[in-house]
């Protein structure tokens, strides 16, 4: 599996290197050519099905296998619901539901939810990249039973205020069509899964920050010497490197 992970990581790296840049992050629109090209390449390469069972058309990899891919995506600052789709398809796969060939986003923060026939209503909070996905996967509790529900996007979207580049939305939904709804298996801890994925993303971002610091200090000169030659700068870089290493331990 290690060789397979290395190959997949190389494919992912090439796609992100080719398509993700500062222009994409600044002017990200669902109908833009740059976004559609990136999305098509990711979907067609089936990178979003890495955690899907083989009998459902996926690669059958484990969560541990995709850690380098989650880190790589964060290092590029990939501004799309790429990892969210991987996790959503994993949850669908665990419920023996075929994965989606489109971007999906997800949340487990819900309020005032109601289900009537095949429709769902409620307030769904802190949904990443909802502007770039047409479907939402939620973990929620209805009548003392936890469910995983996939439904089509609709209703009122409200962009949250945050200091990060990742756009998150609150959704006020009324009678949206349910695509799939299954009882959540007890062995699946969605909250813990999302927290761990976020931690891995944070570590990947910190690695990129460290790399940028080293590159900057190696190129910028003061008093005829690069900053990396100064003892104080070296000490600071070492401290940052230790913090990054500790975070990834």
Say what each PLM segment does.
Residues 90-207, 211:
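FAD-binding core of flavoproteins
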Residues 1-82, 203:
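Amphipathic, small/basic residue-rich leader segments at the start of a protein or domain
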Residues 16-23, 73-77, 95-96, 210, ...:
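Structural signal for hydrophobic packing residues in well-ordered secondary-structure cores
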Residues 10-13, 211, 242-245:
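Solvent-exposed alpha-helix faces
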Residues 3, 23-34, 186-194, 211-242:
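Glycine-rich cofactor-pocket loops
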Residues 78-95:
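N-terminal glycine-rich flavin-associated loop
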